Amino acid sequence: ESVARGTAPGELHCFPGAGPVRHTLNPMVTGTSVLGVKFDGGVIIAADMLGSYGSLARFRNISRIMKVNENTILGASGDYADYQYLKQVIDQMVIDEELVGDGHNYSPKAIHSWLTRVMYNRRSKMNPLWNTVVIGGFYNGESFLGYVDKLGVAYEAPTIATGFGAYLAQPLLREVTENKATLSKEEARQLVDRCMKVLYYRDARSYNRFEITTVTESGVEVEGPLSSETNWEIAHLISGFE
């Protein structure tokens, strides 16, 4: 009734309450490339440990790779807060699954499939999780490597690189994997080491401190922080890019 006649001077009127709706319009603290390579008997994922605030190298010791369970690992580039949220949700899912006590756990493929639904659902609400995620695992004798981005676009591939790595590292990864049917664990490790060095040289948002995580039949192995041997002797010869 008061809405129809308007509010009298000095009279209070309560409008229907609704909280503000906030959307991630642009990411704040971000991580750059994540690399993933399948090898004979497992998968290797690598990412540096830098959280950039715009172009400022703000947080230099943060992990962007998580162990989901004994057969699945996950690496994320993009918004670090959204990655932390995803990590929290996945960790709780894994705990809930273990509490059932039926001897089953999430396979890499299941986590990948679930992530495609979450990412697509959030993008459909115009409030995406601003990440590109790489899922690796070894389950039932098979290596798995999958990609999901903030729109829910997903695929599986023998090599994956996100962010700037899609331009700089992916050609190097494909050059090796397309000429060999399968890689050994040592070959995959050397390849990833080389790509991380190239990314440090060429990507201004990267950092020379990184983690390399391997998943095989025997479980998950996390190495790091690691760093590459670098040589800047020829840097003064490179000009014209200022």
Swiss-Prot record:
Entry GO CC: cytoplasm; nucleus; proteasome core complex; proteasome core complex, beta-subunit complex
Alphabetic keyword roster: Cytoplasm, Nucleus, Proteasome
Pfam families assigned to the protein according to its UniProt record, in alphabetical order: Proteasome (PF00227)
BP-aspect Gene Ontology terms: proteolysis involved in protein catabolic process
Compartments, as annotated in UniProt: Cytoplasm; Nucleus
The protein's role, per its UniProt record: Non-catalytic component of the proteasome, a multicatalytic proteinase complex which is characterized by its ability to cleave peptides with Arg, Phe, Tyr, Leu, and Glu adjacent to the leaving group at neutral or slightly basic pH. The proteasome has an ATP-dependent proteolytic activity.
Subunit: The 26S proteasome consists of a 20S proteasome core and two 19S regulatory subunits. The 20S proteasome core is composed of 28 subunits that are arranged in four stacked rings, resulting in a barrel-shaped structure. The two end rings are each formed by seven alpha subunits, and the two central rings are each formed by seven beta subunits. The catalytic chamber with the active sites is on the inside of the barrel.
Annotated protein name in UniProt: Proteasome subunit beta type-4
Species for this entry: Xenopus laevis
Protein encoded by which gene: psmb4
